[in-house]
């Protein structure tokens, strides 16, 4: 009899909602030349092929910066940079075209063989490259002629969409032609960012050497709004040598993520190309593994609805079994669901609280406060309390009270103070359980 892996079963169950959510979505994935050169590159390609097999529409953009540098060094040729952009002369353009062409063939070959030795062996995976990008020269800046370094002039969005709808992966590189037939070397980060924006992609995903963006203590910041990300970008730009970012890519990707998010791409992810399975962990788990730059948080605070009863029930049941919360039947939840406020993340209810108003006394009880065990290190309790206070003010409530047996200190930290049973509304006094002996605390709204 084969041993069954509980972790595998649990992981598969948790990932199922994301499989359905991502199917049919368009994702632009940016692979810098550093990622292509890393030993984990083969695993990244396998994960991209897996995404494609799950119905995700993929545009893969690759860079070639280290490969170009390597070829130039072999030929004892060095190109200058101006404002962190390579000045591509006639000779280095030929080298760039050679490096980009080799990478395009290598990536195509890897994708084509990525499903070998898997249950999906024999499945056709088409990779399409083409003249989807039209370039134009960067021109002269502060007296420096960028020569064959260029920028995007036009993107054939209809052509890309048509190719994606046919079931192919679109592969784009850093070399593009102009309307006059000249070739230009583009910033791959700009290509990925602009394609994601104009394609109205659901996600932009960038691989860098670091596992996303970290705070000053080295902890990965799971979620950033563009404004906060911009401040971090400015701080890192001041402290980091531009040459260092040439090898890590964090600043380049973060800059692109901010631009894309502000232009309407809902979620932009930064993950590490050094971590095996980072792409899968980021897209198919509750918390991900890297950093998201988002316009709207993945967590939503809202009034509970009838469809939320099952999630609320699952959240509070362990606390009821421990005696922390008073037991509520499913029938009671159905009758009182309109009193509940929930915090929802990707379809999972991770927090809840209920408000029971006593209008004649201008008081309200905040009850059934619960936070999912995996999310108790944040400020979600404070968020629920603030929501309760806002509701109370709008309903002419002057005071919120709670009955607690385990969270006395937390409520005191929020400004609650102890009151006696006879200070409760008369209706609540008659329901007070002296055997449970809960502490009663109040907060002036």
Swiss-Prot record:
Keywords: Acyltransferase, Amino-acid biosynthesis, Arginine biosynthesis, Cytoplasm, Transferase. CDD domains: AAK_NAGS-ABP (cd04237), NAT_SF (cd04301). GO terms for cellular component: cytoplasm. Transmembrane segments: none annotated. Belongs to the acetyltransferase family. ArgA subfamily. GO terms for biological process: L-arginine biosynthetic process. This is Amino-acid acetyltransferase. It comes from the Bacteria. Residues 299-438 form the N-acetyltransferase domain.
């Amino acid at each position: 009899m084969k041993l069954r892996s509980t972790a595998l079963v649990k992981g598969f169950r948790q990932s199922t909602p994301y499989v359905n959510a991502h199917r049919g979505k368009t994702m632009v994935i940016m692979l810098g030349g550093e990622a292509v050169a890393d030993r984990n590159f083969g695993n990244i390609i396998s994960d991209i092929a897996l995404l494609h097999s799950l119905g995700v529409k993929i545009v893969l953009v690759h860079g070639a910066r280290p490969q170009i540098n390597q070829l130039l060094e072999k030929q004892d040729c060095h190109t200058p940079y101006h404002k962190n952009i390579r000045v591509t002369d006639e000779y280095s353009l030929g080298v760039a075209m050679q490096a980009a062409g080799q990478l395009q063939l290598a990536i195509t070959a890897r994708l084509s063989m990525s499903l070998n030795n898997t249950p999906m062996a024999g499945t056709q995976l088409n990779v399409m490259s083409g003249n989807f990008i039209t370039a134009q020269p960067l021109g002269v800046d502060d007296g420096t002629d960028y020569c064959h370094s260029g920028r995007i002039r036009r993107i054939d969005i209809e052509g890309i969409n048509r190719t994606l709808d046919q079931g192919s992966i679109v592969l784009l590189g850093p070399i593009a032609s102009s309307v006059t037939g000249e070739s230009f070397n583009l910033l791959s980060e700009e290509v990925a960012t602009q394609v994601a924006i104009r394609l109205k992609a659901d996600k932009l995903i960038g691989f860098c050497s670091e596992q996303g963006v970290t705070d000053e203590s080295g902890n990965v910041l799971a979620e950033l709004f563009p404004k906060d990300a911009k401040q971090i970008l400015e701080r890192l730009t001041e402290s980091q040598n531009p040459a260092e970012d040439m090898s890590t890519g964090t600043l380049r990707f973060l800059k692109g993520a901010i631009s894309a998010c502000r232009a309407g791409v809902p979620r932009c992810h930064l993950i590490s190309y050094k971590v095996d399975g980072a792409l899968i962990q980021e897209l198919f788990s509750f918390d991900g593994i890297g950093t998201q730059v988002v316009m709207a948080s993945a967590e939503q605070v809202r009034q509970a609805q009838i469809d939320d009863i099952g999630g609320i029930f699952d959240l509070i049941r362990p606390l009821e079994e421990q005696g922390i919360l008073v037991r509520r039947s499913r029938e009671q939840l159905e009758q009182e669901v309109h009193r509940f406020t929930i915090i929802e993340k990707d379809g999972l209810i991770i927090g809840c609280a209920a408000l029971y108003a006593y209008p004649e006394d201008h008081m309200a009880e905040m009850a059934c406060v619960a936070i999912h065990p995996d999310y108790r290190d944040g400020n979600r309790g404070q968020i629920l309390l603030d929501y309760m206070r806002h509701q109370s003010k709008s309903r002419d409530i002057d005071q919120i009270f709670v009955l607690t047996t385990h969270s006395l200190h937390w409520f005191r930290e929020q400004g609650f103070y102890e009151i006696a049973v006879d200070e409760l509304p008369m209706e609540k006094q008659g329901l007070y359980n002296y055997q449970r002996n809960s502490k009663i605390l109040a907060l002036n709204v």
